[in-house]
Amino acid sequence: MIKLNTIFDYPNISLHFDLHISLGEKIAIIGESGAGKSTLLNLIAGFEPVKQGEIRLNGENHTYTAPHQRPVSILFQEHNLFTHLTVWQNIAIGLRADLKLSKEEIKQLEKVASAVGLTDFLSRLPKELSGGQRQRVALARCLLRDKPILLLDEPFSALDPHLRQEMLTLIDKFCREKQLTLLLVTHQLSEVIDKIDRIVEIKNGQATEREIPR
C-alpha cells in the first residue's frame, strides 16, 4: 500500500502528489516528458527529498527513511549492471553487497533466475548478453529483494515491442503471484492496458486519475 501527500519543488514548478494506492494494485503513470513521473517514483523510493508532506508505505511512515530501508524495489531504463560481475553476481548483489548468500538465498536466486529465463546465463558477463537479457538480469535483482512495492521507470522502452510484451507479461505474472503493488511509468499505454488497474497522469504538477480506455 502507498499513501502520499507530498510537495517537491523544481526551480520552475512545484509538484504536489496526493495518491492512495491499495495493496496489489497495478498503476500506469503517464505524462509528457519532464512532467514529474520519474520524480514521483524517486520520492517513493527515497532518492528525492520531500519538501513537505508524508509518504506511508505498507502502513509505515517512510517520509525520511533511507532508500535501503524502504519496502521498495525500483528498475530504471538503464539496467545498471556491473560489467565485471557475472549474471549470478549481478543478481546476488541486490541482496548482499559482499555476495555471500546463504543456502536459502542461493535457492531463491536460482528460482528467480529460472522464472526470468536466465538459468543458462548465470556464469556470463553482461557484455555477452542481449539488451533484453540484461534487463532480465536487472529485473531478477529487483525480484530477489522480495519487496512488496515495485517501481518501474520505463525499464523496457529501449526494447522492441515483442520483447517489451514478454517482459510486461513476466511482470504481470510476478505481481499476481506475490500480490505486489506496481507503479509503472510508460509512454506505451496501449501495451499495458490489459495489465493495469488504474491510470495516473502527471500534468501541471498534479497527479490525476484517468479512465482506462477499453
Swiss-Prot record:
Which EC number(s) are documented for this chain? 7.6.2.15
Where can this protein be found?
Cell inner membrane
Which positions bind ATP? 31-38
Which membrane topology term applies here? Answer: Peripheral membrane protein
Q: What is its main location?
A: membrane
Please write the reaction equations for the catalytic activity of this protein: thiamine(out) + ATP + H2O = thiamine(in) + ADP + phosphate + H(+)
What is one term from the GO cellular component aspect held by the record?
plasma membrane
UniProt entry tagged with the keyword Cell membrane: yes
Q: Which Gene3D superfamilies match?
A: P-loop containing nucleotide triphosphate hydrolases
Name the enzyme's class.
Answer: translocase
Q: Coiled coil located at which positions?
A: none
Which branch of life, at top level? Answer: Bacteria
Q: Please list the GO terms describing molecular function.
A: ABC-type thiamine transporter activity; ATP binding; ATP hydrolysis activity
The residue ranges of the ABC transporter domain are 2-212
Give the keywords, sorted.
ATP-binding, Cell inner membrane, Cell membrane, Membrane, Nucleotide-binding, Translocase, Transport
Q: Which PROSITE patterns match?
A: ABC_TRANSPORTER_1, ABC_TRANSPORTER_2, THIQ
Q: Does DNA repair appear among the keywords?
A: no
* Assembly, per entry: The complex is composed of two ATP-binding proteins (ThiQ), two transmembrane proteins (ThiP) and a solute-binding protein (ThiB).
Q: Which family does this protein fall into?
A: Belongs to the ABC transporter superfamily. Thiamine importer (TC 3.A.1.19.1) family.
Q: What does this protein do?
A: Part of the ABC transporter complex ThiBPQ involved in thiamine import. Responsible for energy coupling to the transport system.
Q: Per its record, how is this protein called by name? A: Thiamine import ATP-binding protein ThiQ
Source organism per entry reads Histophilus somni (strain 129Pt)
